[in-house]
Amino acid sequence: MEDIVDATKRALAQMDVTQRRRVHYHIDSSEWRSWSNPEFLLYDKGIRLDEVSGSLRDAVMEVLRACMSPEGYDKAVAAMRINGFLGELVQAPAIMNEYLYNFVLFGDEPSTTRPWGFSF
């Protein structure tokens, strides 16, 4: 769990004040359950990986890596790459690309003792 907390704190350290404000929601927020994955964004919350710096995007990806087995992480990244390929194939990278994913935090600062979570 410490690896996940540390990776998330490193991602937060990369964010500016506006991004930090945009990414944080209360632990009981209804946004926790408002997840979707169509070609277009239904719920605009958090930060979009295709709109942030490469270093912040890499830091968020490290959060995923910390939460998954190596095989699971490789599968997730492969699915993201396929999404990018499909966007190129149909010439619609604005609505389908490798990094068209949002990252959102719920709860206070990431901790090993207090409730929190994230959505990707």
Regions found by a protein language model. Give the residues of each.
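Mature N-terminal segment immediately following signal peptide/propeptide cleavage
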Residues: 1-28, 34
